């Protein structure tokens, strides 16, 4: 009788907010709504704005590493800017904190400032509050030329689908840390989990090339993000299992943990690579400019298909890493 | 040995972050740092950006009224824009939520969208997460002409100090609600507590007049905000008890609660009026354009003095509503 928000799941919850907002505001006012970041008209450019909130108990594999927590808070926001092909311009940090040791607090801030330096996005404002756990809310501000900005919509049947780097590494690292097992020999996966790097340069290359038809970042899992591009573009997608660039260490870590490596690559967030579409000739040009891995193609419709190593085609269910997931 | 952040208090904690950021970034890059909102260069204008985070258990006198919670989340952010004399342009909402009833969630969003409409700031983006309590993080975006923007710095000795409306009403309403007593007859104070209104129009009048030397909003209590203007301007302040425009109902509510009405007006947040300084001739002009109450004057230095009803001068301690307060 009294439905709860978990009965909808995160994506439908967001759609619910978006449709309410669209019913009230003009479509030119809410251009970026539903995309990775919001767009504000600033003359010849767009100001690109995004806000993401991270909680000590839910978003950090190791909450004993405050510097990494600060770094990651900036990175998840910068990754949304990267997904729009936008150049970072500044960062705002709102925190709510328990009564931390000053040394811990300073390390947290060092991580934030270190990341702000890395992304050339000065810390320009903020707010502090008290809370029972560490809550870190970031707002990233960037700029993009109006006709260059990357959106989720625009993929066309026949376009190729590509990712900017290996898949499943952040997921494998995160699961390894959470398992409490020895992480020796897997420093790269651990680093990718604790100190992910947003693909700002790659986003700028993609945007400035003018060759890309749609793009997003893989923070919620590849299949979920393909679903986003598909829904925004009104197309389908077909990907090939043997073209997925699984990270080198992913099979071994998955085996240690008794997990399916493909599941880590397809349905887990934390990769922070970009996934994008471009016509075949454009993709060819782009491959001379940057690392990219073509994993499939855009289809007319009918959801996401995967062709496995034996050539058998099956449908992928779009779930990804859904917070507030049903059931 | 291991100091905690509570040993510093909120203001010193913020100063600590600011001085770290200033040591790394150029001063032109971090113009608004320490002010009510951040400033981003956008040609002839500034983009004005602010982010505030509210928690179910700490910032809402009645967490059973989701629509009011949504409204207030937008308002506290808009109030920072008002303090800069900026026109709202958009709002971004990041939420982390427990598994709410859908009806409660919809009311929360109705409150957000209602407030966005009121302030003419479309909801342009957002993010959702799971959490154990309701966490609402807003980012407000506004615009201001470069030479018009209101800052905390700029007050000069001899300027007058004024506020845009009655003091202590939101505080009295909040304390009355929290006491669990009958609120009958005090609808105005209750409304001011649950559905405060940011002084956007007043901020725009002040900014466009070009007459104002410094300004901020009174979310953390009058004395605390006077301290902010003073510190940023390198001056002192003198205020007169008999000029403070205590809200009509404040003495009666204070008496019911056994509280000092003056304390509610001086040291409690929730008023959402603006406090500002201007030279005497400018203040005269402004008083023809809007409601304002002159409460004192800017002095050369020496902290905040209050002259009481008997003409006795004493020092006010700058504490206001400090989160993370020492001791």
Swiss-Prot record, chains A, B:
GO terms for biological process, alphabetical: thiamine biosynthetic process; thiamine diphosphate biosynthetic process
Record: residues binding Mg(2+) 5: 220
Top enzyme category: transferase
Residues that coordinate or bind Mg(2+) 2: 52, 80
Binding-site residues, ATP: 126-127, 152, 219
UniProt-listed SUPFAM superfamilies: PurM C-terminal domain-like, PurM N-terminal domain-like
Annotated substrate binding sites: 59, 270, 321
Binding site residues for Mg(2+) 1: 51-52, 127
Pathway: Cofactor biosynthesis; thiamine diphosphate biosynthesis; thiamine diphosphate from thiamine phosphate: step 1/1
Reaction it catalyzes: thiamine phosphate + ATP = thiamine diphosphate + ADP
Entry EC no(s): 2.7.4.16
Binding, Mg(2+) 3: 36, 80, 217
Other known facts: Reaction mechanism of ThiL seems to utilize a direct, inline transfer of the gamma-phosphate of ATP to TMP rather than a phosphorylated enzyme intermediate.
Family assignment from sequence similarity: Belongs to the thiamine-monophosphate kinase family.
Function: Catalyzes the ATP-dependent phosphorylation of thiamine-monophosphate (TMP) to form thiamine-pyrophosphate (TPP), the active form of vitamin B1.
PANTHER family membership: THIAMINE-MONOPHOSPHATE KINASE (PTHR30270:SF3)
Protein name: Thiamine-monophosphate kinase
